[in-house]
Amino acid sequence: MATGIPASELRELSNEELTTRLKESKEELFNLRFQMATGQLTNNRRLSVVKKDIARIYTVLRERELGLSTNPGGDAA
């Protein structure tokens, strides 16, 4: 049951919260890749889900950078 974070939920977060989520997701991806290399990974689907979550976070940040969406937590960066 590996489901990702919906983009609509990400759009409600501030830039600081998004960067925090991005950092956490990158750390999780690193750990999953390490588990895969050592043969300890039991849920292969989670690897793909985390990658897509990272892409969604980058997309929301880029939308704000281009002014396509607003930042609910403060000024548009």
UniProtKB/Swiss-Prot annotation:
One of its GO terms (molecular function) is structural constituent of ribosome. The keyword Ribosomal protein applies. Keywords: Ribonucleoprotein, Ribosomal protein. Gene3D superfamilies: 1.10.287.310. GO terms for cellular component: cytosolic large ribosomal subunit. It holds the Pfam family Ribosomal_L29. The keyword Ribonucleoprotein applies. GO terms for biological process: translation. Belongs to the universal ribosomal protein uL29 family. This is Large ribosomal subunit protein uL29. It comes from Corynebacterium urealyticum (strain ATCC 43042 / DSM 7109).
